[in-house]
Amino acid sequence: MQAAVRFEQHGRPHSDLMTWLGNYRAVTPGVEVGDNTTIRLDQDNEPQPDAFLRIAPSHGGQSRTGDDGVVDGPPELIAKVAASSASYDLHDKLNVYRRNGVREYIVWKVLEREVVWFHLCDERFEQLQRDDAGLFKSEAFPGLWLDSANLVAGEMAQVLQVLQSGLTTSDHAEFVVRLQQEADKRAEKS
């Protein structure tokens, strides 16, 4: 029998994280979100993160879906809800994801009521800093903005309002155009 998954420490935060990522995917053609999916990074590491966001293979993404349905290669962003495993998620997994080219890694430390966001820079993970308004803004996914204070407080209406602000930026619009251009280029070659 599997270990119990607690509602407050995992179930609700996981649902909120998926809601945020799913809303981004809904208005960003060429982007895919996964929930508890096995990812084959290398011969020694097949994690099953809580969530991931990737650029679809057809739109230039760095991961593929194998014939067995497992994701091969690193998605651009991985997210984890961590209660008791925060130390493992911030050390061992962090290094595995870095070595394999995951561009961004989010860890929601539920018990500490904190979100930590890392981005890959020169083959090293560095913490992404919040802007002056206290928001995280993804570098891999333009327009993916996170109000982490409201996320940990369970204020999803505010989280989605901030995300919507990111989705109305010219950076997001240009990203959608770039994704479509990449898909068109790949379609012409096939």
Regions found by a protein language model. Give the residues of each.
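Gly/Pro/Ser/Thr-rich low-complexity, intrinsically disordered segments predominantly at protein N-termini
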Residues: 1-190
